[in-house]
């Protein structure tokens, strides 16, 4: 009997889910078991991530499911997992700020991330077949209008403005540090990036040359402005978008991907020193590993949401969360005593908001997220299947082009960020299909 890839994925996810749940229950009953349990679930986290990435590898390692796992691991899990063998001695490395660091809640936080992660993959597996059939029914959106492709020039102009203004902020950042970002308006010019990105998207839609590598490169170059003002996560997300389309065309080897990863972490380390205003890394290993561990800062928001849940609920109600602009990230920071009023806050994260909203709303959110992930992954599989027909795969490439940066960054963003992005893309695709149908009818009439 041959076991399919999906069955392996289900077995792996179910085992990971049950191991974490069982160990969590034992630890609640007997807190003395926590230190050993912490090591066990840390090892299981690494194994689970590696196995899922290997199981989902079809055309290459770079695919939506891989990016989902990478997002959780590097934005959430890497720090608690890295220090798992000596957690008691390294508590201040895992939770760097706050009123009182509780080792037991650090363990609980890790388990509370692992369990929804396994549940997400299970939900993804359940929906994958249906979603794949749905994706196969998407309309062909390939059309162009040469005159509208001139908007590419406007995109280039906005990119230049954004990079110039970001460089000026970069000079200021070297003098004041990121913890004074709001006071000096370091993030006031980010809208120029949004303008340039939308111009590139419109140009991609209506120009004859639908080169996704070219447009990914243009957006990535523009996103360098983010890293200049200390927001390196966005630059990394758009860098991975470029790598994805390069991998689709050239099938990048793992050694080149590792080389790019080392290069990115080294550059991030140098920018981090400049951003904070002090030397935080020493030696080659410090330059490579410390930026990775610093990316795991979103684990602190998970810890805060779990340990100080009642304080956060008193700070921001569900009504405020859904219907006002009140920031849950600030409430998490305030609850654990690390609020930076002029910038540099820990903000929020996918899993901290999952904890805040509770398991009923959270389960619905995970169901929707798994559906969205299956939708984007199915588009990737259609691209691989139709790799020799660029026109046939255009719609699927377009969807991934629009959705992938949000997926790469999802673990650090809000709970509904990726879900709403996929919803808007679906509405956009529907509207674009209508526009194309009308345009073709007009062309036939003439």
Swiss-Prot record:
Where is it located? Answer: Cell inner membrane
Is-annotated flag, keyword ATP-binding?
no
Indicate how the chain sits in the lipid bilayer. Answer: Multi-pass membrane protein
Molecular function terms, GO-annotated: transferase activity
Q: Which UniProt keywords apply?
A: Cell inner membrane, Cell membrane, Lipopolysaccharide biosynthesis, Membrane, Transferase, Transmembrane, Transmembrane helix
Taxonomic superkingdom: Bacteria
Q: Where are the transmembrane segments?
A: 11-31, 33-53, 58-78, 104-124, 147-167, 186-206, 211-231, 252-272, 355-375, 391-411, 415-435
Q: What Gene Ontology cellular-component terms does the record carry?
A: plasma membrane
Name the pathway it acts in. Bacterial outer membrane biogenesis; LPS O-antigen biosynthesis
Q: Which reaction(s) does the protein catalyse, per the Swiss-Prot or TrEMBL entry?
A: n lipid-linked O-antigen repeat units = a lipid-linked O antigen + (n-1) polyisoprenyl diphosphate
Q: Which GO terms describe its biological process?
A: lipopolysaccharide biosynthetic process
**Principal subcellular localization:** membrane
Q: What is its EC number?
A: 2.4.99.27
User: Which purpose does this protein serve, as stated in its record?
Assistant: Polymerase involved in the biosynthesis of the lipopolysaccharide (LPS). Catalyzes the polymerization of the O-antigen repeat units on the periplasmic face of the inner membrane, leading to the formation of the lipid-linked O-antigen molecule. In vitro, shows a preference for bacteria-based, undecaprenyl-containing substrates rather than eukaryote-based, dolichol-containing substrates.
| Name of the protein this chain belongs to | O-antigen polymerase
Q: Which organism is it from?
A: Escherichia coli
């Amino acid at each position: 009997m041959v076991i399919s890839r999906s069955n392996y994925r289900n077995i792996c996810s179910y085992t990971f889910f049950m191991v974490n749940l069982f160990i969590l229950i034992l630890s609640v009953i007997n807190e003395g078991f926590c230190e050993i349990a912490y090591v066990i679930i840390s090892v299981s986290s690494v194994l689970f991530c590696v196995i899922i990435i290997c199981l989902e590898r079809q055309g290459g390692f770079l695919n939506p499911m891989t990016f989902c796992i990478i997002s959780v691991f590097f934005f959430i899990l890497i720090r608690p997992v890295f220090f798992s063998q000596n957690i008691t001695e390294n508590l201040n490395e895992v939770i760097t700020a706050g009123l009182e660091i509780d080792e037991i809640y650090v363990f609980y936080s890790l388990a509370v991330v692992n369990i929804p992660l396994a549940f997400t993959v299970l939900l993804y597996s359940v929906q994958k077949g249906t979603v794949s059939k749905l994706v196969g029914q998407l309309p062909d959106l390939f059309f162009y209008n040469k005159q509208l492709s001139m908007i590419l020039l406007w995109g280039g102009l906005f990119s230049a403005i954004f990079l110039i203004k970001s460089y000026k902020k970069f000079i200021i950042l070297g003098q004041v540090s990121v913890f004074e970002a709001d006071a000096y308006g370091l993030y006031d010019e980010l809208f120029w990036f949004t303008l340039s990105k939308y111009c590139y998207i419109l140009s991609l839609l209506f120009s004859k040359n639908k080169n996704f590598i070219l447009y990914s490169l243009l957006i990535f170059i523009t996103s360098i402005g983010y890293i200049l003002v200390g927001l390196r996560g966005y630059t990394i997300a758009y860098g991975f978008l470029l790598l994805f389309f390069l991998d689709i065309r050239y099938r990048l080897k793992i050694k080149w991907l590792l080389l790019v990863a080392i290069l990115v972490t080294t550059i991030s380390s140098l920018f981090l020193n400049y951003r904070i205003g002090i030397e935080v890394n020493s030696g080659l290993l410090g330059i490579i590993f410390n930026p990775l561990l610093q990316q795991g800062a979103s684990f602190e928001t998970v810890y805060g949401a779990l340990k100080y849940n009642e304080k956060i609920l008193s700070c921001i109600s569900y009504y405020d969360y859904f219907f006002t602009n009140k920031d849950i990230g600030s409430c998490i920071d305030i609850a654990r005593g690390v609020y930076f009023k002029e910038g540099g806050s820990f903000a929020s994260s996918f899993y901290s908001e999952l904890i805040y909203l509770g398991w009923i709303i959270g389960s619905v959110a995970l169901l929707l997220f798994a559906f969205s992930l299956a939708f984007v992954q199915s588009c990737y599989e259609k691209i691989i299947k139709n790799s020799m027909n660029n026109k046939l795969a255009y719609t699927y490439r377009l969807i991934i082009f629009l959705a992938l940066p949000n997926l790469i960054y999802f673990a650090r963003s809000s709970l509904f960020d990726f879900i709403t992005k996929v919803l808007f893309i679906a509405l956009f695709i529907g509207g674009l299909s209508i526009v194309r149908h009308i345009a073709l009818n007009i062309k036939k009439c003439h």
